[in-house]
Amino acid sequence: MNDYTQQLQGKKDYLKTLFAGLDVPEWEVYESPDKHYRMRAEFRIWHEGGEMFYAMFEKGQKASGASLIRCDRFDAASEAVNCLMPELIAVAAQSAELRNHWYAVEFLSTLSGEMLVTMIYHKRLDDEWMKAAQALQQQLDISVIGRSRGQKIVLKQDYVTETLRVGDRDFHYRQIEGSFTQPNAAVCRKMLEWACRAAEGLGGDLLELYCGNGNFTLPLSRYFRQVLATEISKTSVSAAQWNIEANWIGNIKIARLSAEEFTEAYTGKREFTRLKESGIVLTDYAFSTIFVDPPRAGIDEETLKLVSQFDNIIYISCNPETLRANLDTLTETHTVGRAALFDQFPFTHHIESGVLLKKKIL
């Protein structure tokens, strides 16, 4: 058993133990590549003895020379990131404007090799920095953003466009710097395909909470008459709207509401101008299914009451412990029809999982 297989087996065993006592079917397991799976990476820039290099630090340790890990390459990151790392630091080292007070760097790449680099500084960025950064951007064929306290300078664009094939169709996603996106594109594609298989034959309308940039929304829209998706982040809502239009999808509407706010609107406790302004009338929908992909804290108690009203629940979780706690409630009214482990974060303790629940027939 190699290192990757061993760590994955540990995650399977953990889930079986955690969900013992619940009637959960055999876990479907979706593996990750064991190298070059992360589309995002971030490093400190360490300056020492006239040299600078990429660095990380021992987990739980204060950032210092004692805890420093030099990173001339980073096998977890995409091949595009690894190819760019030495070129970027070599070019930046030749320019005092780029080199001085350069504190950290963030890479955001795509499967096609498109690259956005955010260079973070402990100094004010001026016109001289912009000239040097524009030359770097052109030389390396990348997009560059400069950040410092109170400053964000976008030289070309602040996003990349990822393309993921799901079933027989390509979906194009604008991924904006600083916004959440699934870091492991290969496993993300498997998650999308699993969710689509779970949705097959359900019909009716879909409600999605916590939709982000529309990652799941776009492919799932093919399986429902109408989709209403909610998201609180303005940046994510903007990206989701762009993604919907770019993919020529006509049956999705986005409501800029938190899950808690939508619960208030859906139950009639409160009216929201944002819904009216978006032309969204909740009584126009006949929801058969709810899709949720909540933050690590899981679903709050009031939203959980809302979720339990739907015939079908597709639940993607980034925290199996809060999923287990939520299932203790949801399995009072629903049965678990499918369960999946997605190894989105190899060689870490983090586990991404998904379940399909169907309402019990009384």
From Swiss-Prot:
Coiled-coil ranges from the UniProt annotation: none
Enzyme class, broadest EC rank: transferase
InterPro entries tied to this protein: MeTrfase_TrmA_AS (IPR030390), SAM-dependent_MTases_sf (IPR029063), TrmA_MeTrfase (IPR011869), U5_MeTrfase_fam (IPR010280)
UniProt keyword list: Methyltransferase, S-adenosyl-L-methionine, Transferase, tRNA processing
GO terms classed as biological process: tRNA methylation
Gene Ontology molecular functions: rRNA binding; tRNA (uracil(54)-C5)-methyltransferase activity, S-adenosyl methionine-dependent; tRNA binding
A cellular component term, taken from the record's GO annotations: cytosol
Keyword Aminoacyl-tRNA synthetase set for record: no
Pfam families the UniProt entry points to: tRNA_U5-meth_tr
Reaction(s) this enzyme catalyzes, per UniProt: uridine(54) in tRNA + S-adenosyl-L-methionine = 5-methyluridine(54) in tRNA + S-adenosyl-L-homocysteine + H(+); uridine(341) in tmRNA + S-adenosyl-L-methionine = 5-methyluridine(341) in tmRNA + S-adenosyl-L-homocysteine + H(+)
Cysteine disulfide partners in this protein: none
Active-site annotation: 318 (nucleophile), 352 (proton acceptor)
Sequence positions that bind S-adenosyl-L-methionine: 182, 210, 215, 231, 293
E.C. numbers: 2.1.1.-, 2.1.1.35
SUPFAM superfamilies, alphabetized: S-adenosyl-L-methionine-dependent methyltransferases (SSF53335)
Listed NCBIfam families: trmA_only
PANTHER family named among the record's database cross-references: TRNA/TMRNA (URACIL-C(5))-METHYLTRANSFERASE, TRNA_TMRNA (URACIL-C(5))-METHYLTRANSFERASE
Homology family: Belongs to the class I-like SAM-binding methyltransferase superfamily. RNA M5U methyltransferase family. TrmA subfamily.
Function noted in UniProt: Dual-specificity methyltransferase that catalyzes the formation of 5-methyluridine at position 54 (m5U54) in all tRNAs, and that of position 341 (m5U341) in tmRNA (transfer-mRNA).
Record's protein name: tRNA/tmRNA (uracil-C(5))-methyltransferase
Gene source species: Neisseria gonorrhoeae (strain ATCC 700825 / FA 1090)
Phylogenetic classification of the source organism: Bacteria, Pseudomonadati, Pseudomonadota, Betaproteobacteria, Neisseriales
Name of the coding gene: trmA
